[in-house]
Swiss-Prot record:
ATP binds at residues 34-41. The complex is composed of two ATP-binding proteins (HmuV), two transmembrane proteins (HmuU) and a solute-binding protein (HmuT). Its EC number is 7.6.2.-. GO terms for molecular function: ATP binding; ATP hydrolysis activity. It comes from Rhizobium johnstonii (strain DSM 114642 / LMG 32736 / 3841) (Rhizobium leguminosarum bv. viciae). This is Hemin import ATP-binding protein HmuV. It is a peripheral membrane protein. The gene is hmuV. InterPro entries: AAA+_ATPase, ABC_transporter-like_ATP-bd, ABC_transporter-like_CS, P-loop_NTPase. It is found in: Cell inner membrane.
Length: 264
């Protein structure tokens, strides 16, 4: 379980997020959503241990700011929103970096682990390509493969591991969006936990168990998809008169963007 309690972050003397609190459970996909600049990425960086914070962030009972980098690397993998690499690394070299940053439980199977990670993100055959030669979406999937090498198992020694994904599908076509979200969903079903910063509310409704909505650096709403995705919440958080509908087959909510546009 990841417990976020009263978390605040200040950067350059300015408060970016204030008093954020929610719980993410292993076996579930928790989405963080909200308008641009609402504090989603800052919240994720506090959870991952990348930013100093006030309040408390606990992973499996341990306070994040009290854990050493190697301890964090063993229990959580982080996919950043963007990754710029100046040196001409190949895809194989970048993916294998994940093997050196995590526990690497099976060093004798390093090549198989890297190959499986690339296959899971539909990049088999890209091993020898240079990272800079790839499209933005391909680079994003390479970075996810690296994370999957670092956190290759959802449960280690009986304790869940975590994937912290900041906008994991932002550069992807719809087919690969579904591939990556299914991968994240499967990680949860195998006992791990996922927190993902998301913009696509329909993908969020389709794959997430719980959603945390942020606005202006504060928590606006948190709960199940059905509890949070309402017409009233959409108007309060996004300022759009969006209409929430439901898929007839199972009642999954979806956002009808057309409803926010006035046509003559």
């Amino acid at each position: 379980m990841i417990e976020v309690s009263g978390v605040s972050v200040r950067l350059s003397g300015k408060t970016i997020i204030s008093d954020v609190a929610f719980t993410a459970r292993a076996g579930e996909l928790t989405a963080i959503a909200g308008p641009n600049g609402s504090g989603k990425t800052t919240t994720m960086k506090a959870i991952s241990g990348e930013l100093a914070y006030g309040g408390s962030v606990r992973i499996g009972g341990g306070e994040v700011k009290g854990l050493k980098p190697w301890q964090l690397a063993a229990i959580r993998g982080v996919l950043p929103q963007a990754s710029t690499i100046s040196f001409p690394f190949t895809v194989r070299e970048i993916v294998r970096m994940g093997l050196t940053s995590g526990l690497n439980l099976h060093p004798d199977k390093a090549e198989q682990t890297a190959a499986a990670a690339l296959a899971s993100v539909d990049l088999t055959g890209f091993e020898g390509r240079f990272y800079q030669e790839l499209s933005g979406g391909e680079q994003q999937r390479v970075q996810l493969a690296r994370v999957l090498c670092q956190i290759a198992e959802p449960i280690v020694d009986g304790k869940p591991c975590w994937l912290l994904l900041d906008e994991p599908v932002s550069s992807l076509d719809i087919s690969h969006q579904l591939t990556i979200m299914t991968l994240a969903r499967n990680f949860c079903e195998r006992g791990g936990g996922v927190i993902a910063v998301m913009h696509d509310l329909n993908l969020t409704a389709l794959f997430a168990d719980r959603i945390v909505l942020m606005k202006s650096g504060r928590l606006a709403a948190a709960g199940s998809i059905g509890e949070v995705l309402t017409n009233e919440t959409m108007l309060a958080v996004f300022g759009c008169a969006l209409r929430i509908n439901q898929v007839p087959s199972d009642g999954t909510p979806f956002v009808l963007a057309h409803s926010a546009i006035s046509r003559p």
